[in-house]
Amino acid sequence: MKRLFLLSCCALFALTLPAFESASTHAQTLNVTSSNGQIEPSGTLPVLFVNTDNGVDVVDKETYLTATYYLDPMGDTTITAFGSKETPLPLQIKGRGNWTWRGFEKKPYRLKLDGKAALLGMKASKHFALLAHADDPHGFMRNAVGFFLSERFELPWTPKQRPVELVLNGDYRGLYFLTELIRVDKDRVSITEQPDLCIHADSITGGWLVEIDNYDTDPHVAITEGDGETIIFTYKTPEVLSTEQTRFLTDEMSRLDSLIYGDKQSIELWQYLDIDDLARFFLVQELTDNYESFHGSCYLYREMGAAEKWHFGPVWDFGSTLNHSKTQPFYEGREHHNTWAPQLALFPAFQDKLKALWELYSPNLITDLDAYLQAFVESIETAAANDAERWKTQGYGNADLEQDLVHVQQFMHDAALWESNRLGVTPPEPTITIRWRPLNEWTDKQMAFVWGESIEARFVKPVQDGDCYTYTSTDIPLNILFVNGTYWTTRGNQTVDINNLTEDACFEVLADTATTAPHTGKHAVKALDCSTLTDHFNTPYLYNNTEATPVKVLHNGQLLIIHNQRTYTVLGTLSDEE
């Protein structure tokens, strides 16, 4: 049965939402090509202009090319410009990634600025990635979902990403995501930076930043797992190891492996591996069904000190997620060897930690994620259409973000339900939140009216800031009638029927035109498609319903069903008292 996904009035993450709000606020009409037929930026997002010396193309991942850049906010006053066409700033650029570099014409890049810069509102740094996400068929939402969950589960640090359009050497390259790189830094992975070739016993205990890797091309150490498979650890910090450092890292990973494959009732493992961060990290991989996690792009870090533990994180690559309905753990029955994940899942203490964290973080999680993704899609949809046009000859792009949004939201709803069932966590009663956004001053009689098959009809009044209404019900279906406060006895809104409500649902009432006189203006519930506002009030004292489905309204104290051709049926008389 089709599920309605609706906007939440809950606050989104302050670190992410402003970029989306500004992008949609300054959206312009799509202009795909210029007069000479060349595809141009959409004008709805900031544009990063990069020019290499002599226009040399970026062809490898090993050698930085000298270049310049400037960032044009495209009229968005919330974003700081860096450089200009006349006075660009110095930059170095090279390729990055593995499959995403080899498999697609739309390439990802690594940037190294000449000096630290707080690009697109992110923490100032010299090091950023430009991720192309050419391998993401789900509306560029894979990393967006993974990073959202990481922040929600409060992992110590989560990379930030911001949408931007890229013009490289005068060629429009489409929609990219400027992303913070995983590095040892006070604003990223905040641990002591261990020097290369260190030999001192105390110093080689940390800090360490390593990656469980599925490629053996980078400097690494390798051990044989308890199941006979080889596991590779690429070290990021330090970058060049002494004999002592190599021995320390190898011994540490070997000890973890021995304990992970050892007695599942023992608690000794948790003396060396942080169980809280592991559980938070694990939940992100499980909910997104990231079957490549614990196989590649899987980071661990350790602070300096003999008593310090290893921590899983930060999250990074979600390029294989959100594909099919969630029916099994991410580490079972997959093509990749997920190293330690299956063994870790067998520890009762770890399962208890997963359940405790899920009980803590799952309420309203999916409702908030729905709202976040809605804002995300609205911010990039015009640029995504340009991107799809730019790369259509290559057979990739995301031209239908609304369809992608439906898929991702459905996937995450199903995954959350699957996780609740697996951990034995009973979801809370669904809460229906009604939010008004009037254009003019409304009276205190603004309200909503709810009723169902097994509940008595009642009014719902404000509980927060005078504009937010909350009503909790398990009655299915539940009907909601939104009532205009100024003219509440003579006009109202359409009714929404909710089927199979299992999550918190939120409805936002939009005033499309000023309500300067009775029976004028448009009011509707903003739901998933959000594309049409139906006007039921264009004839004085006679409601006109042009929809195929009857609409319930409040008129002169009576609850009416408005049929086609302006006929109605009286359901009953209502009082303005609760």
Residue ranges and their predicted role:
Residues 26-145:
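Conserved NTP-binding catalytic cores of kinases and kinase-like/nucleotidyltransferase enzymes
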Residues 116-118, 127, 132-134, 154-159, ...:
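Internal "kinase-insert"/substrate-recognition segments embedded within catalytic cores
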Residues 534-578:
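C-terminal outer-membrane/trafficking sorting elements
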Residues 1-4:
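Positively charged n-region of N-terminal signal peptides that target proteins for export
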Residues 428-537:
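Insoluble glucan recognition modules
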Residues 138-169:
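A conserved helix-loop-beta module that forms one wall/lid of the active-site cleft
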Residues 45, 56-58, 89, 100, ...:
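Middle-to-C-terminal accessory/interaction subdomains
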Residues 13-24:
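C-terminal segment of classical bacterial N-terminal signal peptides
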